[in-house]
């Protein structure tokens, strides 16, 4: 009964946004990590995303091993939900050891490779197929458009080939997460945005070495 009540308590805390309380409970009893791992298999995307963030926090506090964190993040990257995938990539980006061990490029390659495989045309496998733009690609194109330039929204929309609704959604996300900044209507990359762009470009250079 104690395990069941703890599971319910943790889930309720997560639903109510009380992440610090969840972290404290797990720090007091690391066996409760199993509950977080279980939630990662849930169909509730927001619950899954929050649990990814909790794992990232626990790793930074030394409560979760890098191999365990990477294992669960990679499992999420192979799913079909783009929001969960994006959050997994952003958590990976915050882990210095990932860059040192060159794991981030391998993981992103696995994700992109899955996307390509899903889009393959069985009639012509001689070249890589076109991949439908997803959230990662749209973010990449916005960051690339802003790089080394001070652009206003219309020029970014044109350079990244975005309609107004899509631009508004993504530019809001990038501003809120401090990948870009806006000053007097002009957008520029932050150091955090430059780092993300650099890592994605490294992956594309590995996939398309002749371009």
Curated annotation (Swiss-Prot):
UniProt xrefs under Pfam families: HTH_45
Entries under Gene3D superfamilies matching the protein: Winged helix-like DNA-binding domain superfamily/Winged helix DNA-binding domain
SUPFAM superfamilies xref list: ARM repeat (SSF48371), Winged helix' DNA-binding domain (SSF46785)
InterPro entries: ARM-type_fold, ArnR1-like_HTH, WH-like_DNA-bd_sf, WH_DNA-bd_sf
Protein name according to UniProt: Uncharacterized protein MJ0290
Species in which this protein is naturally found: Methanocaldococcus jannaschii (strain ATCC 43067 / DSM 2661 / JAL-1 / JCM 10045 / NBRC 100440)
